[in-house]
Amino acid sequence: MQSSSLNNYNSNKNFIIMLIILFLMEFARGMYILSYLALLPTATSIAVGITSIAISIHFIADATTNFVIGFLLKRLGTKLVLTLGFLLAFASLFLVIWFPTSPFVLIASAILLGIAVSPIWVIMLASVDENNRGKQMGYVYFSWLLGLLVGMVGMNVIFKFHPTQFAFLMSLVVLIAWILYYFVKVRLTNYNTRPVKQQLGQIVDVTKRHMILFPGILLQGASITALVPILPTYATKVVGVSTLEYTMAIVFGGIGCAISMLFLSKIIDKHGTLFMYWVIFGGFVLYTLMIFALSLITNITIVWVLAVFIGLMYGILLPAWNTFMASHIHSDEQEETWGVFNSVQGFGSMIGPLVGGLITEFTKSVNNTFYFSALVFLFLAIFYGIYFVKVNNKTKTS
């Protein structure tokens, strides 16, 4: 009994430290990718094209690395892979201190940082307790979201004092995360030293076995990120508000999401599979309606209220969807499978802004991008609604 309590204590301690490490790494990413690179053209001679390439290539590096990182963790071990990850992240941001406006350094650092954060995410997802998946995934996504937002906002404030003088803070945050890593014990589900050819075959096998999940993984990311390029235009040109009021809408959405992830996500653990299906289906339907509603609204107060509801729904939909994905994963292939899932999600997030921007550019209307995003969620609601009904009927008859 005492041994069991000690194991639970150590497990919880490891999980909390890993959450802090994830928060710090996403904090550094938010500072560099979402703030520093985005703001640099406004205060220096660096071209917008350079920073845009750096941001895009960061997510490409992240998605590509996710595809193979689970297999590398099994083959090389967590200590080597994570140490190299922290080293790459620290080195990439340390270079920015000395060459803050060098196009080559900015792009190279973005690539290295994209590679470096990948193993943290995969290990975090694979180490979640199955009995408390909804609650713990709420904490994981909260740490991720909080890290990105606080990092971005913090760097935005610091940037106003001096664009490059405080660049050292980014590498300092990574260094703190690196030090914390030595206080946590990371275990994999199963160490694997099979030949590379067999592991590549396993990637194909994992991909084939989880095809039913890929539309949801790919299209959710694409649908949400399709709105990113057009939201500022929608706020200033359609709703007719200032950048500050637009930022408040994002903050309200973030608050709603945080409340949901911290308090509502644990509901998923207390109910059965059918409840999870209803949350996912209902989430997709509500997202369809709320995104479509944005194309009709020109009152900022209503937009703020809608932002809170969107955040609340996202905060419970994400853990429910994660629990649904986890139910398809073999217990000894968690790192590999989560890596593939993250990679597919990353590619969806890359496609979204491109599609959203092109739709607005060619149709000359931001509303058409809202229609596209809403239709994608409607498709997901119908697709998975039919799937859930079939699975539920099969369960009843068996």
Curated annotation (Swiss-Prot):
Pathway: Cell wall biogenesis; lipoteichoic acid biosynthesis. One of its GO terms (cellular component) is plasma membrane. CDD domains: MFS_MdtG_SLC18_like. Pfam families: MFS_1. The chain crosses the membrane at residues 15-40, 46-73, 80-99, 105-126, 138-159, 165-184, 212-234, 246-264, 276-297, 303-326, 338-359, 371-389. One of its GO terms (biological process) is lipoteichoic acid biosynthetic process. It is found in: Cell membrane. InterPro entries: MFS (IPR011701), MFS_dom (IPR020846), MFS_Efflux_Transporters (IPR050189), MFS_trans_sf (IPR036259). One of its GO terms (molecular function) is antiporter activity. It is a multi-pass membrane protein. Keywords: Antiport, Cell membrane, Lipid transport, Membrane, Transmembrane, Transmembrane helix, Transport, Virulence. Proton-coupled antiporter flippase that catalyzes the translocation, from the inner to the outer leaflet of the cell membrane, of the lipid-linked disaccharide (anchor-LLD) that anchors lipoteichoic acids (LTA) to the cell membrane. Belongs to the major facilitator superfamily. LtaA family. This is Proton-coupled antiporter flippase LtaA. It comes from Staphylococcus saprophyticus subsp. saprophyticus (strain ATCC 15305 / DSM 20229 / NCIMB 8711 / NCTC 7292 / S-41).
